Structure formats: C-alpha cells, structure tokens
C-alpha cells in the first residue's frame, strides 16, 4: 500500500503516532492524583497550542499547564477577565487531547458560572482547573490594583465547583491574590477556608 502525504509534517506526525493518545481523560486524572500523593514537585510547563503540548509530552514533563494570560495574549487581548469560557475551553480541549499528560487550565474567576465552567472543562478532557478569588474584572497576577471577592463568596464558588464535577479525580485548585490586598495573615485564613471547602 502506498500512502501519500501532503507534506513532510503530515508524514512525520502520522508515522510517529503523534495524533493518537493512549490514555483516557479518566486515566490521566488518576495518574495526576497518584503523582500528587507522592508529595513531590511536579513540572507542568505552559502550552499555548497543541504542538507545544506535544513537545512537553515528548520531553517527559509531568503535565501541561494552560495559562489564562497566554490564552488572552493569543486572542490579542489583555488578561483582565475578558476572555470567555468558549474561547478558553476551545483551545484547552485542543491542547488536552493531543498528549497522554494531564492538563490543568486557568479558569480565571470561573467565567461567571462555576458550575458550567467545571462541567465544560471536565467534559473536554482536562484533568483540573484553578479558580481565583479576584472580582470578575480580574487583573493578571503580576499586575497591581487587584480586587478580591469576600471570603464567603469564594468559599461558595469553590463548593459549587466541587459539587459540579462528575469525576472525583478532576482537580479543583483555588488560587488567591489576597497577600497583596489583605496581607499574609488574611491570606493564610483564606487558604485554610478554601482547602476546607
């Protein structure tokens, strides 16, 4: 049988099984949970497209991180809370499905609907996401003048996220910007409350 390819890239990708994954989303989540139990540092370089994710896999890292700032920049907009769930989930799905590594995506503040956000990312094969405690018109983590929501509102948001997942192995990661706004003691209080939620 003679195969014809449109270019060398197609030939290489097909003959090196670069478009097939061997692990299901569930298996990737279990693998991540097991690695976390070992309490060792895991390396999750950021991927901005599927090819980068494939390189991360080929090099042998532990997982793939999908940054909200990178998604915003890829769309040509600043990382100030104006990307949508549709935009981020589309690219996150492309990245997550290309390798056998678990993928964690930045869910910003939950895109206005934590339940829908978690269900979407879980259905698209992500291994987890992180949600931050800034107001919806958030600012990228390294920018000044951030505002955070009240502690009880963030706890409610985390509970909604946790209750929305179908697979208990899907990770919900809470992220805080409280240190800059409220100081270290309030930050520790928030982190403990988030963990309990």
Question: For the regions a protein language model found, what residue spans apply to each?
Answer:
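Extreme N-terminal cap/leader segments of soluble proteins
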Residues: 18-50
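Alpha/beta enzyme core
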Residues: 29, 42-44, 48-79, 83-98, ...
């Amino acid at each position: 049988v003679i195969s014809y390819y449109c270019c060398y890239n197609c030939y290489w990708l097909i003959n090196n099984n670069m478009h097939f994954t061997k692990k299901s989303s569930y298996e990737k989540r279990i693998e991540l949970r097991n690695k976390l139990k070992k309490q060792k540092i895991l390396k999750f370089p950021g991927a901005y497209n599927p090819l980068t994710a494939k390189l991360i896999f080929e090099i042998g890292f532990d997982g793939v991180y999908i940054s909200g700032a990178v998604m915003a920049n890829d769309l040509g907009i600043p990382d100030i809370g104006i990307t949508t769930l549709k935009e981020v989930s589309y690219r996150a799905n492309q990245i997550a499905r290309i390798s056998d590594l678990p993928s964690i995506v930045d869910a910003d503040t939950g895109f206005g609907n934590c339940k829908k956000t978690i269900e979407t990312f879980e259905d698209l094969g992500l291994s987890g996401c992180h949600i931050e405690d800034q107001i919806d018109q958030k600012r990228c983590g390294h920018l000044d003048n951030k505002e955070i929501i009240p502690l009880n509102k963030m706890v409610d948001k985390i509970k909604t996220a946790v209750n929305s997942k179908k697979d208990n192995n899907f990770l919900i990661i809470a992220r805080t910007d409280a240190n800059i706004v409220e100081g270290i003691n309030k930050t520790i209080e928030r982190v403990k409350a988030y963990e309990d939620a």
